[in-house]
């Protein structure tokens, strides 16, 4: 039963039912169990990403990071890399957008054209933008913080978290049943995470089913709820819940016919 797998992700979680409650349909059972489950899966992702962000903040406060000297910064980031198993790249960027990665050193590309970069220069943390990494080509989730010295932004530290590795981590840690489909949509409806790697970073319109487009619109418009739609000739029911950390909508679905 789905609830058994949920307990692997969230210790101590229980769902109480009154002894006199009327019998529920299989669809009702799925909706109740899935609502607990999707919030558990969301918690795994939020905990991981917030942990990466916290670690970056700690690194950004060090004298080595604030020095702006790559060799000094690299030592700090190398230690960070050892504790993150979902990263595609760990990097230090300068205000002009030039950057170095722990894996490759100086990069030929520049980050100044990234939509999130002005926020870093303004002294703001960044969590959740979806990009195809310039240095690795992997579909990645940006987690980054500014580095300041004497009140001035002198650079930024970032981790490009691989979407596929993060999705796999959730599935493995929670022992997710094979008949369930988990995905997370960003504010535009793009799939930040997906159990099926081929659908990561794609929009519902890319799949071409109008009922999925309508269901996605409903998901994006609400904090929590249930939808149904057709995909590849099958009817699918899904429950969803919003992450306060990223703003993503986490969706757990199952085919019913």
Predicted segments — roles?
Residues 1-13:
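N-terminal secretory signal peptides and thylakoid transit peptides that target proteins
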Residues 20-69, 82-86, 125-126, 139-142, ...:
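Juxtamembrane extracytoplasmic/periplasmic/luminal helical "stalk" adjacent to the first N-terminal
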Residues 47, 51-54, 80-99, 125, ...:
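Short N-terminal helix-loop-first-beta-strand/juxtamembrane motif that initiates sensory/input modules
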Residues 69-84, 156, 160-202, 209:
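Solvent-exposed, extracytoplasmic
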Residues 81, 92-109, 196-201:
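Structured interaction and signal-relay segments at domain junctions
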Residues 99-173, 221-235:
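Extracytoplasmic/periplasmic ligand-binding sensor regions of membrane-associated signaling proteins
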Residues 106-108, 134, 198-201, 244, ...:
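Short, surface-exposed beta-strand-loop junctions and turns on beta-sheet-rich folds
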Residues 207-257:
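Extracellular/periplasmic juxtamembrane segments that couple receptor/chemosensory ectodomains to their
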């Amino acid at each position: 039963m789905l609830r058994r797998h949920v307990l692997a992700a969230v210790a101590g979680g229980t769902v109480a039912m009154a002894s006199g409650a009327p019998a529920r349909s299989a669809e009702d059972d799925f909706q109740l169990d899935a609502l607990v489950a999707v919030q558990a899966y969301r918690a795994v992702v939020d905990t991981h990403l917030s942990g990466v962000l916290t670690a970056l903040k700690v690194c950004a406060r060090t004298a080595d990071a604030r020095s702006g000297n790559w060799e000094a910064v690299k030592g700090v980031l190398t230690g960070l890399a050892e504790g993150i198993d979902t990263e595609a790249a760990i990097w230090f960027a300068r205000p002009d957008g030039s950057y170095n990665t722990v894996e490759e050193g100086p990069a030929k590309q520049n980050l100044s054209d990234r939509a999130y970069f002005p926020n870093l220069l303004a002294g703001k943390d960044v969590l959740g933008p979806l990009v195809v990494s310039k240095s690795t080509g992997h579909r990645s989730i940006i987690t980054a913080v500014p580095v300041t010295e004497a009140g001035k932004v002198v650079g930024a530290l970032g981790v490009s978290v691989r979407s596929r590795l993060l999705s796999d981590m959730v599935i493995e840690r929670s022992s997710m049943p094979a008949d369930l489909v988990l995905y997370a949509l960003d504010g535009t409806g793009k799939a930040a995470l997906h159990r099926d790697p081929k659908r990561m970073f794609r929009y519902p319109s890319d799949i071409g089913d109008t009922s999925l487009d309508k269901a996605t619109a409903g998901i994006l418009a609400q904090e929590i709820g249930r939808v149904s739609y057709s995909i590849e000739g099958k009817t699918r029911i899904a429950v969803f819940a919003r992450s306060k950390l990223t703003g993503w909508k986490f969706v757990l679905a199952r085919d019913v016919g």
